[in-house]
């Protein structure tokens, strides 16, 4: 396995954060990102960038972090018990975008790199990441295009890559207590190191670089769609699923909280406004029912 180069990964991640923020500002056309740099007592730090109350985006957060620690937290060793007790270095860019218009989907993306070390043993390293889409009023053409772009990103790395990481995304972003997916999926990968550092890093870069290619056309297509209070209330209700998933199941959120990460940055993914409603059921045949009937179970889109 080729030797990992954390400095090269960090340089890419910082540049990716800059480029994604610039792209989102251009899409919004009004609001700007505010940067907030922070340090962590146990080692490392990062920069959170948040755009609020824009013309298109109600809130968009793009976070870079690079943290080190003396012992891997439980969230990171639950499926890798052999790593317990190792020191670690983790870096990544993660983002969540909550649009104003309910016809624009919420989206999340993340790319990350881990190294776990122990004296007298080779370092264990891996890449992870992906992106996923959470529509409120879905359009089939948007979902198919999103998945076609995902497939195109994966294609140079092998025909088996897209179906594998698409399936993993469907399984990961699932709420067992609701028996529904968080959205329409995308890509999710973790523990990526089998092909060696260069190839694994190349795939992580392709996913990070491909995010705006997948998302921007959907924003452009839907940002001027008219909506009213009904659509807004449904958007706020469905945002509740986002909160439920992130606080109950998401490994990244748990990792951040368990490692003494910066709470404001970790919870940047939360929607600025959200509502719950007791025993909500969409009206049969309504646009809201279309989401439940056709988009919250895994499907083959391409």
From Swiss-Prot:
Transmembrane segments: none annotated. GO terms for molecular function: coproporphyrinogen oxidase activity; metal ion binding; protein homodimerization activity. The keyword Mitochondrion does not apply. It is found in: Cytoplasm. The keyword Glycoprotein does not apply. It holds the Pfam family Coprogen_oxidas. Pathway: Porphyrin-containing compound metabolism; protoporphyrin-IX biosynthesis; protoporphyrinogen-IX from coproporphyrinogen-III (O2 route): step 1/1. The active site is at residue 108. InterPro entries: Coprogen_oxidase_aer, Coprogen_oxidase_aer_sf, Coprogen_oxidase_CS. The record marks 177 as: Important for dimerization. One of its GO terms (biological process) is protoporphyrinogen IX biosynthetic process. It catalyses: coproporphyrinogen III + O2 + 2 H(+) = protoporphyrinogen IX + 2 CO2 + 2 H2O. Keywords: Cytoplasm, Heme biosynthesis, Metal-binding, Oxidoreductase, Porphyrin biosynthesis. Signal peptide: none annotated. Gene3D superfamilies: Coproporphyrinogen III oxidase, aerobic. Substrate binds at residues 94, 110-112, 260-262. Its main location: cytoplasm. Its EC number is 1.3.3.3. Homodimer. Belongs to the aerobic coproporphyrinogen-III oxidase family. NCBIfam families: PRK05330.1. PANTHER family: COPROPORPHYRINOGEN III OXIDASE, MITOCHONDRIAL, OXYGEN-DEPENDENT COPROPORPHYRINOGEN-III OXIDASE, MITOCHONDRIAL. Involved in the heme biosynthesis. Catalyzes the aerobic oxidative decarboxylation of propionate groups of rings A and B of coproporphyrinogen-III to yield the vinyl groups in protoporphyrinogen-IX. This is Oxygen-dependent coproporphyrinogen-III oxidase. It comes from Shewanella baltica (strain OS155 / ATCC BAA-1091). The lineage of its organism: Bacteria, Pseudomonadati, Pseudomonadota, Gammaproteobacteria, Alteromonadales.
